[in-house]
């Protein structure tokens, strides 16, 4: 599967993910990039994966994507006390999701204009993905976006950034339930391949390979900057982690030759990923509401990409394990713990609410720097894993003004930003919905095909009887197609390669590519 097909496909037909067929080695290239701009490094990284967009057109997409950022460096590095903070919040919605989402939205537009196709993006968000996606595609003629968020489980600012966008192609859906409920509904909808094809559905979150790819870039820019600044030849990086897409991008950068000696995974009290890497325990618990809501997740969408590589790229094993996890079972495999981790590339830790608030207060009082709650989690855990002779790069994933109540409670300071101030008194629009796939399907159908006179079910209604679905068994395999099986996802183009499916049958992936070529873009999204 080529890059553009992978972007539009998003997921394999069975709901699985895409991974690159091969990972390029840039060990001899990145040391020459010290004087390059963010956009130049972005182009040089992406060129190894984007094989079907001409170089000059790719440069135009990149330039358009980052022209919206408020800092000319896009992702500047600030040295604060014992750590170096990579500021990823200078985009339109003040969150790290803008870095990849602006690129993805402009890539969508490029492909759809070229193919004269339309796309209906369906997504769910735990906070920042929703607003970043909405601001990325608002007003784009060939795209509609349907974005679910869990009621009462995002910050007020995050919700306002979504619901105050009134463009005709934007539909905000407020779901009774948790973010994990939203993800479950997404998987159920996108497993219905008939519905996907007939409604031209597409993905914008980190299940879409292009999102992860774009995030790889700032590990190179940030790492090169911090090594240049300190004179060191390697560095560590601490990443606030919920859905595993951000730190997975760091893992890819490491495989590509960037000298990251340790990937530090930081979670809040929703610690499923920290438990996995520390103890090998990937058992799901109840979602806990915290002051870092974008990490309030108990089922990380990108985890199966890591699992695919960890299991030796064995699709059937990944498919079997992830199916068991969806049924409420633990992982049907044991990973030995050595040196406090099941993988020497990773270290992991958790920050409680008290520890998060204490970190916010400490950095405000000691360094006059405000950290948003997610960044504070990363800094707290990162400080626990400082190397003796290596700099620690901590990813700052959101501007503190997105979480004013938490900042005020932690240190008594008002966190403000002009972008946030403009939200006050804004008109909003939002549709309440059940956490049910049939309700979501009906709303999408009524919106796209209004002449059929079907209405969305109100909250409290009984879900409609399920319709027949056409999904592909993750454990199936096939030969003779352009894609081959990977577990519960698929392989996307990289270094001139075609795409491969993690858990979807190869023939099914090939069929999806064919459908895409006929103006039917299929995929899925979670945040």
Predicted regions and their residues:
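Terminal export/targeting leaders at protein ends
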Residues: 464-469
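Extended hydrophobic/Leu-rich segments
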Residues: 457-459, 493, 527
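Membrane-penetrating hydrophobic segments
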Residues: 487-504
């Amino acid at each position: 599967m080529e890059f553009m097909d992978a972007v539009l496909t998003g997921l394999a037909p069975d709901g699985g993910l895409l991974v690159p067929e091969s990972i390029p080695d840039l060990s001899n290239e990145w040391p020459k990039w010290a004087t390059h701009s963010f956009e130049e490094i972005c182009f040089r990284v992406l060129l190894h994966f984007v094989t079907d967009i001409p170089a000059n057109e790719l440069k135009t997409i990149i330039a358009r994507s980052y022209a919206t950022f408020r800092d000319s460096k896009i992702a500047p590095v600030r040295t604060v006390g014992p750590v170096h903070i990579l500021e990823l919040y200078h985009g339109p919605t003040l969150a790290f999701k803008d870095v990849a989402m602006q690129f993805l939205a402009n890539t969508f537009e490029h492909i759809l204009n070229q193919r004269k196709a339309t796309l209906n993006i369906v997504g769910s968000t735990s906070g920042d993905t929703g607003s970043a996606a909405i601001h990325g595609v608002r007003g784009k003629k060939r795209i509609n976006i349907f974005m679910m968020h869990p009621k009462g489980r995002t910050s007020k600012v995050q919700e306002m950034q979504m619901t105050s966008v009134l463009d005709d192609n934007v539909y905000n859906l407020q779901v009774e339930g948790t973010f994990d409920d939203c993800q479950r509904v997404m998987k159920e909808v996108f497993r219905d391949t008939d519905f996907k094809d007939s409604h031209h559905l597409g993905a914008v979150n980190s299940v879409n390979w292009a999102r992860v790819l774009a995030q790889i870039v700032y590990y190179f820019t940030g790492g090169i900057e911090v090594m240049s600044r300190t004179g060191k030849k390697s560095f560590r990086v601490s990443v606030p982690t919920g859905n595993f897409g951000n730190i997975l991008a760091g893992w890819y950068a490491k495989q590509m030759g960037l000298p990251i000696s340790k990937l530090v995974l930081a979670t809040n009290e929703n610690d499923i990923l920290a438990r996995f890497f520390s103890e090998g325990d990937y058992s799901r618990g109840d979602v806990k509401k915290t002051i870092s809501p974008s990490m309030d997740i108990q089922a990380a969408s990108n985890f199966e990409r890591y699992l695919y590589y960890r299991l030796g790229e064995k699709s059937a094993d990944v498919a079997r394990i992830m199916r068991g996890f969806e049924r409420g079972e633990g992982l049907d495999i044991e990973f030995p713990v050595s040196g406090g981790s099941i993988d020497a590339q990773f270290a992991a830790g958790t920050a409680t609410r008290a520890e998060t608030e204490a970190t916010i207060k400490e950095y405000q009082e000691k360094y006059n720097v405000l950290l948003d709650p997610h960044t504070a989690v990363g800094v707290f855990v990162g400080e626990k894993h400082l190397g003796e002779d290596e700099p620690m790069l901590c990813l700052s994933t959101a501007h503190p003004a997105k979480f004013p109540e938490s900042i005020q409670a932690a240190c008594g300071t008002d966190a403000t930003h002009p972008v946030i101030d403009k939200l006050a008194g804004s008109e909003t629009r939002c549709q309440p919905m059940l956490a049910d796939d049939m309700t979501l399907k009906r709303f999408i159908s009524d919106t796209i095909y209004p002449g059929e006179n079907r209405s969305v079910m109100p909250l409290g209604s009984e879900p409609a009887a399920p319709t027949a679905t056409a999904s592909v068994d993750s454990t199936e395999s096939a030969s003779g197609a352009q894609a081959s099986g990977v577990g519960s996802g698929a392989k996307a183009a990289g270094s001139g390669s075609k795409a491969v499916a993690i858990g979807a049958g190869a023939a099914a992936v090939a069929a999806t590519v064919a459908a895409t070529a006929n103006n039917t873009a299929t995929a899925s999204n979670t945040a």
